[in-house]
Amino acid sequence: MKYNDLRDFLTLLEQQGELKRITLPVDPHLEITEIADRTLRAGGPALLFENPKGYSMPVLCNLFGTPKRVAMGMGQEDVSALREVGKLLAFLKEPEPPKGFRDLFDKLPQFKQVLNMPTKRLRGAPCQQKIVSGDDVDLNRIPIMTCWPEDAAPLITWGLTVTRGPHKERQNLGIYRQQLIGKNKLIMRWLSHRGGALDYQEWCAAHPGERFPVSVALGADPATILGAVTPVPDTLSEYAFAGLLRGTKTEVVKCISNDLEVPASAEIVLEGYIEQGETAPEGPYGDHTGYYNEVDSFPVFTVTHITQREDAIYHSTYTGRPPDEPAVLGVALNEVFVPILQKQFPEIVDFYLPPEGCSYRLAVVTIKKQYAGHAKRVMMGVWSFLRQFMYTKFVIVCDDDVNARDWNDVIWAITTRMDPARDTVLVENTPIDYLDFASPVSGLGSKMGLDATNKWPGETQREWGRPIKKDPDVVAHIDAIWDELAIFNNGKSA
């Protein structure tokens, strides 16, 4: 699944019936959200609104609205192939030298992919075909969506924010929502543990009073966007990972007003700075939990330059109660997580983040249990191994005879293999999602682990129940005569 940029990818989608062009005028204020939401819930195509009311720039929505399109964005044909992406990430996270010639031969595809890791810097780029600066900067010319009736203001949702800390060689790419508050002002909502916020904190400590350079790319190629939301090892840049996914080096260009590098093929780039100490109240906004979040203060991003392609496309989305686009992304990226976890915990058979659990707040893990207390070790491992699971409130651990993706199986295991007092683990005062208003303190809450495995000696003193199993000979015999029985046919059985 080869493509060079977002437009290339849209052409591929259109050829496969995965893109619908909407020529009817539609308002970015609430109407696009309503159409995109109905389309996503029906498993429909990506949507390109060619005539948003009041604007000359088209709006792209629902790009990653199905797991298949997420897989395509990662250079794969289908979701099942994303396990291979996870295996590659697991290898890069903890690379092992070849153990011999045969092992070297087996690892050659991985080593070959690594050759696509370095970025390629261009002198000129499509994203700088048109440039406005100073008083000519006007974010109101971009069809920024207002998604829900009580949202505070139009909101940029798919902005790829590029930052660099004062002591770091490589840049950080993150996706943070940005509230429009003026023709050249946005509120940068990044949580304190996120890469961009950490870069900013380090900058303030190293350069008191100096402006912090920031650039935001809109409409980057899908591999680069997905690289920013994937559990990339800390030693690997998101641009490098995008090159691995795409099979070609990521092309970047230096910004006009700062030294940051942005995707050369991005549709729009916002360049500017954060003035230390300048903050503004952000929100409320409807978010992925299905609720409006609290108002809180975040840094203000001042835009000094807007560069863009000719006939630029504005890429956007909405977030709300699942299913939404982030939930679909979570379903697809779930397949990437499994091999990474299995690399650290080989006993893990499957790992599932149900989308109805806001994509990350609840996890179901199945394991090949090997000793008493094993389930609790896995719980602690899930919470601590990848930062993506820092906010996972509930971890349910089951044996490998349970299908982690079937609630009927999981609920059966919980209700038959758990004693609430013995098999529930509660951990207090842990990092929790700022948007989780159920926690007693903003950003700090508790976690619960549920051990729904069969109990081993040492975990119980009682004789453990034996699951009912059918007689295989009887099953085979009934299979052979099933059609003759005609139970579900109108005709009579023989």
UniProtKB/Swiss-Prot annotation:
Binding residues for Mn(2+): N172, E238
Name of the featured protein: 3-octaprenyl-4-hydroxybenzoate carboxy-lyase
Assembly description: Homohexamer.
Binding-site list for prenylated FMN: I175, Y176, R177, R189, W190, L191, R194, G195
Catalytic activity field: a 4-hydroxy-3-(all-trans-polyprenyl)benzoate + H(+) = a 2-(all-trans-polyprenyl)phenol + CO2
Residues the record marks as active site: D287
Source organism of the structure: Escherichia coli O1:K1 / APEC
Cofactor(s) for this UniProt protein: prenylated FMN; Mn(2+)
Pfam families found in the cross-reference section: UbiD, UbiD_C, UbiD_N
Subcellular compartments: Cell membrane
Membrane topology: Peripheral membrane protein
Recorded name of the encoding gene: ubiD
Keyword hit for Cell membrane: yes
EC number annotated for this UniProt entry: 4.1.1.98
Function: Catalyzes the decarboxylation of 3-octaprenyl-4-hydroxy benzoate to 2-octaprenylphenol, an intermediate step in ubiquinone biosynthesis.
Pathway linked to the protein: Cofactor biosynthesis; ubiquinone biosynthesis
Main location: membrane
InterPro entries xrefs: UbiD, UbiD-like_C, UbiD-like_N, UbiD_bacteria, UbiD_Rift_dom
Record flagged with keyword Flavoprotein: yes
Record family assignment: Belongs to the UbiD family.
